[in-house]
Swiss-Prot record:
<dbReference type="InterPro" id="IPR036390">
    <property type="entry name" value="WH_DNA-bd_sf"/>
</dbReference>
<keyword id="KW-0805">Transcription regulation</keyword>
<keyword id="KW-0678">Repressor</keyword>
<keyword id="KW-0804">Transcription</keyword>
<dbReference type="InterPro" id="IPR029016">
    <property type="entry name" value="GAF-like_dom_sf"/>
</dbReference>
<comment type="similarity">
    <text>Belongs to the HrcA family.</text>
</comment>
<dbReference type="InterPro" id="IPR002571">
    <property type="entry name" value="HrcA"/>
</dbReference>
<comment type="function">
    <text>Negative regulator of class I heat shock genes (grpE-dnaK-dnaJ and groELS operons). Prevents heat-shock induction of these operons.</text>
</comment>
<dbReference type="GO" id="GO:0045892">
    <property type="term" value="P:negative regulation of DNA-templated transcription"/>
</dbReference>
<dbReference type="InterPro" id="IPR021153">
    <property type="entry name" value="HrcA_C"/>
</dbReference>
<dbReference type="Pfam" id="PF01628">
    <property type="entry name" value="HrcA"/>
</dbReference>
<protein>
    <recommendedName>
        <fullName>Heat-inducible transcription repressor HrcA</fullName>
    </recommendedName>
</protein>
<dbReference type="InterPro" id="IPR036388">
    <property type="entry name" value="WH-like_DNA-bd_sf"/>
</dbReference>
<dbReference type="GO" id="GO:0003677">
    <property type="term" value="F:DNA binding"/>
</dbReference>
<keyword id="KW-0346">Stress response</keyword>
């Protein structure tokens, strides 16, 4: 059936394939010849439909359910369905989906935070785990710093930036500290990053600890901010897989979760999706072929998002192979159009710029004075730390 032309009989068989796949996606149950005849309302006999089923089974498009005797589409059938039907939906999206898409962020300078919110809304609309890739946006600045004591000599430092990024590090304290002392240091550093007068008077020891923590975490931040070999990846909504019947099996759930949490896999799929101007589905065995791994028994659908005509990254959703592809493709297309409009306005209004990963860039270095060229974040000068 791979020829450029097909006979009338082959056309009928492929119609049966598409109809069987459509019915399976709607019901989630194996499709029998009688059920299909009632659904499509044709004058084909059940015996003829069973013969077509047998041919499609031999071609690898269907497999038989040994309990009911009905047929279940294979990954190959879902691929054929996606290629021929997924972009053809005339159905209106559910009102709940439209309402969520209308909540997408408007223009703002908090690019990363807005993209994260958009990802959450997309996940709610589709009830699927979502992820997205993002370049690095230039001239970001630290707007908040928080400290949390792990024990007497370790603290978690959290940096928040103007563009909505959050960085965390666990750092060793040069001297033992307590929660009250660390809180005073936190308030002092928050005043510093906000260019306000200090609200706390610190002892010399506390000031030394604070400046050491700040400079250490800023150097780490600048290093990560400027030296990166792949787009940033954000993921959310893994628990949504539990609502799907196929993922109630612990082994299937483990396969899906391990695939979604594999950063290398998701970055590669989003990179492929970013360079296509439409939704792209990767289904079951196709994922296995790309990564030379066992079949993860799931599907990933990606769509690029743009600033004007420039692709910035891609959003992706993950779910079982029997996804409602038509609804997802339509939702993703509307979603991407709204994101494009918002990002384009934001970039021009706030004069934003961004960088792609470039591991071979000779200007990238761990030397703080070179790193700082890409950001407005600065180290404290020596006189302020003495």
């Amino acid at each position: 059936m791979s020829r450029s032309w097909i006979s009338k009989r082959e056309s009928k068989i492929l119609y049966i394939l598409l109809t069987t796949t459509e019915l399976y996606l709607k019901t989630g149950h194996p499709v029998g010849s009688k059920t299909l005849k009632e659904y499509e309302g044709s004058n084909l006999s059940t015996a003829t439909i069973r013969n077509y089923f047998s041919e499609l089974e031999a071609e690898g498009f269907l497999k038989k359910n040994h309990i009911s005797g009905g047929r279940i589409p294979t990954d190959l059938a879902f691929r054929y369905y996606v290629d021929h039907c997924a972009d053809c939906s005339q159905d209106e999206l559910p009102e709940s989906t439209i309402n969520l898409l209308n909540q997408l962020p408007e223009e703002s300078q908090n690019i990363v935070k807005d993209l994260q919110k958009a990802s959450e809304l997309l996940g709610e609309a589709l009830q699927l785990p979502t992820c997205f890739s993002s370049p690095r946006f230039d001239n970001d600045s630290v707007t908040n710093i928080q400290l949390s004591l792990v024990d007497e000599q370790r603290a978690v430092v959290i940096l928040s930036t103007e563009f909505g990024q959050i960085f965390t590090d666990t750092l060793w304290l040069s001297e033992a500290s307590n929660p009250a002392s660390l809180k005073r240091i936190e308030i002092f550093l928050q005043s510093y990053v906000r260019k306000q007068s200090p609200m706390e008077i610190l002892s010399q020891k506390e000031e030394d600890i604070g400046m050491t923590l700040y400079n250490e975490v800023v150097v780490r931040y600048l290093t990560r901010y400027c030296n990166f070999s792949e787009e940033d990846l954000y993921q959310t909504g893994l628990s949504k897989l539990l609502r799907y019947e196929s993922f109630k099996d612990p082994d299937m759930l483990a396969l899906g979760l391990s695939f979604f949490e594999n950063r290398r896999h998701m970055c590669k799929l989003l990179d492929i999706g970013m360079h296509r101007d439409r939704p792209t589905a990767f289904i079951g065995n196709e994922l296995s072929d790309i990564f030379r791994t066992p079949n993860p028994q799931c599907a990933v659908i990606t769509i690029p998002y743009y600033m004007n005509r420039t692709p910035l990254g891609a959003f992706g959703v993950l779910g079982p192979v029997n996804l409602p592809y038509k609804e997802i493709f339509k939702t993703l297309t509307i979603f991407a159009d709204k994101i494009k409009a918002s990002l384009t306005q934001s970039f021009y209004k706030f004069k934003l710029s961004f960088r792609r990963p470039c591991p071979s860039d000779p200007t990238l270095s761990k030397e703080p004075t070179l790193l700082a060229r890409y950001s407005s974040i600065k180290l404290l000068p020596p006189k302020e730390t003495s």
